[in-house]
Amino acid sequence: MRIAIGCDHIVTDEKMAVSEFLKSKGYEVIDFGTYDHTRTHYPIFGKKVGEAVTSGQADLGVCICGTGVGINNAVNKVPGVRSALVRDMTTALYAKEQLNANVIGFGGKITGELLMCDIIEAFIHAEYKPSEENKKLIAKIEHLESHNAQQTDANFFTEFLEKWDRGEYHD
């Protein structure tokens, strides 16, 4: 199984720990970064993880930022992604079994590394349990997806990053 993983600069260490855990379990990890603590932007990494999952490059995705809120919102903008921000096993299993989630999101400063690893392992092994009801719910969710042709451009974030480098944006 191939698992895409991405994070922002706030949780690089946590992502590396999760990545090493997954590798130790025999999973192929596709690490989209970030790889250090240099200030960066979570939408970039959420987009990369989401695109890897929806293109078939990865089977599942894991997104981590400080609270998990930002990167999870970003990855959910990729058409075909169904990501759940979780902090507990029950929510993660519900997301996979009932909503066929293909990405899982965490707040790396909220949820500890060991718990994240346990939840991810359970998420990987959980199976979607299709029913007429949840098929209809998933179809309604998919109907809400917005397809932005610009989003598939490899340079989608270039202008934003150039403005950042010029000091036009601030934290």
Curated annotation (Swiss-Prot):
EC category name: isomerase
A Gene Ontology molecular function term of the record: ribose-5-phosphate isomerase activity
Biochemical pathway: Carbohydrate metabolism; D-galactose 6-phosphate degradation; D-tagatose 6-phosphate from D-galactose 6-phosphate: step 1/1
Keyword Isomerase: yes
Pfam family, one: LacAB_rpiB
Disulphide linkage map: none
Record field: catalytic activity: aldehydo-D-galactose 6-phosphate = keto-D-tagatose 6-phosphate
Keywords: Isomerase, Lactose metabolism
GO biological process: D-allose catabolic process; galactose catabolic process; lactose catabolic process via tagatose-6-phosphate; pentose-phosphate shunt, non-oxidative branch
This enzyme's EC code(s): 5.3.1.26
NCBIfam families according to UniProt: lacB (TIGR01119), PRK05571.1 (NF004051), PRK08622.1 (NF006381), PRK12615.1 (NF009258), rpiB_lacA_lacB (TIGR00689)
Subunit details: Heteromultimeric protein consisting of LacA and LacB.
Similarity field: Belongs to the LacAB/RpiB family.
UniProt-recorded name of the protein: Galactose-6-phosphate isomerase subunit LacB
Organism: Streptococcus pneumoniae serotype 2 (strain D39 / NCTC 7466)
Lineage of source species: Bacteria, Bacillati, Bacillota, Bacilli, Lactobacillales
